[in-house]
């Protein structure tokens, strides 16, 4: 850890004599009397924290100011590095981060030698841009309230401070104007950031943290803001305002550096906007820093050039969102058009056939009108149909028509056919049967003294007189005794069966008697081998 810092600061001429110090106010007083022709970053750094020193340190979580210092091996170089951490930052060099060094959140680390050896113009802009990083809200969601000291990089550099320089650096996911760091500074700050990320284990949003590094004489950030803004040169404020506007236009939670509470109070709303407009913050893993899109990496000094890449993104996003309803509308428009075309297309072919039919009808009328004999044959089928319907009308009025007779005949035997005389006889029998049933049922209804003919009246007549039990209308529930009705044919069959039975019995009796006498005559000399068997088999 010490070697990269010493190498980065080797090119710097020490502006102050090496005087070891134990507290930050002493280091500030040592840096203040150094004269410099150009407003170098070290002079700006020394002037900024020295003015708010007499303010009340009551808001500081740790009341002891000397705990914010670190004993350093090389006092001149290390003091400048520690003081330039929260304040001195490089000029706006786009969002091109050196991610290849695997150093997450290196934008708040110590400044390198090129930063301190810059000219006066970059110094003013760099001194104004980093200060805006401290003015942003220092709230970090999920950060424990108790101070967590980070382990010292080397045994010689013991950090008794409760809030070391790399404590607030690990929660700044996106660069706040100071992401253009050198490789040396990124290498120096990467182990501290990794160690703190390992101990904390909190995946934070990129811009929730703030550059809360070493604070001189127990000052808070809110106390430093008015003094920092008052000590800025006019050029820094003029150059910073368009850049801050550009940051706000990109919804990166970068309020303007002017010390106004209204701008700083909009952090929550900008956090919500950032969560919406920058989904890569929540989707990135915990230990790896999120890579911004390529549109945010190039940074231009002019506000017009900075705002231009954002405008096409808005158009692209809106155009990406609008094609879906446009496509839906176009599909909805195409569907009725297709339906109309489909409706019109059948109508057109139908309209064309109608015309030939009309022409054919006219031709037929012209052809048939002079020819008189052709009309009577056309009228004859109608007359024939009328005669056929007249013949079928009386049969249709009957209960059992010829159609029903043919259907019954087809069910019995499809090959059989009935003569018309037989069909008439069957229809007459059906009519007589229905009339007899209705008359007897009406008589039963009158006997019950009711004007309505019910099903039980007809069932009583049908079951008793005709021995017919129609399915679904049986009267078994109210009629327990059923009288057997025998016909003459049935009686004749029963008589024939009885005669046959008697004849068989008589024949069997004759055969048994003859077989018994023969056995008696032939069995006088010989005894039967099985005398019981003959009797049993005969009987």
Swiss-Prot record:
InterPro entries for this protein: Histone-fold, TAF12, TFIID_TAF12_dom
Subcellular location: Nucleus
Tissues in which the protein is found: Expressed in roots, leaves and inflorescences.
Any one Gene Ontology BP term: DNA-templated transcription initiation
Region listing for Disordered, in residue ranges: 1-396, 508-539
Bias type Gly residues, positions: 200-209
Keyword Hydrolase: no
GO annotations of cellular component type: SAGA complex; transcription factor TFIID complex
Classification via SUPFAM superfamilies: Histone-fold (SSF47113)
Segments of skewed composition (Low complexity): 30-50, 103-130, 323-350
Chief subcellular location: nucleus
Keywords attached to this entry: Activator, Nucleus, Transcription, Transcription regulation
Record's function text: TAFs are components of the transcription factor IID (TFIID) complex that is essential for mediating regulation of RNA polymerase transcription.
Protein name: Transcription initiation factor TFIID subunit 12
Origin species: Arabidopsis thaliana (Mouse-ear cress)
Taxonomy of the source species: Eukaryota, Viridiplantae, Streptophyta, Embryophyta, Tracheophyta
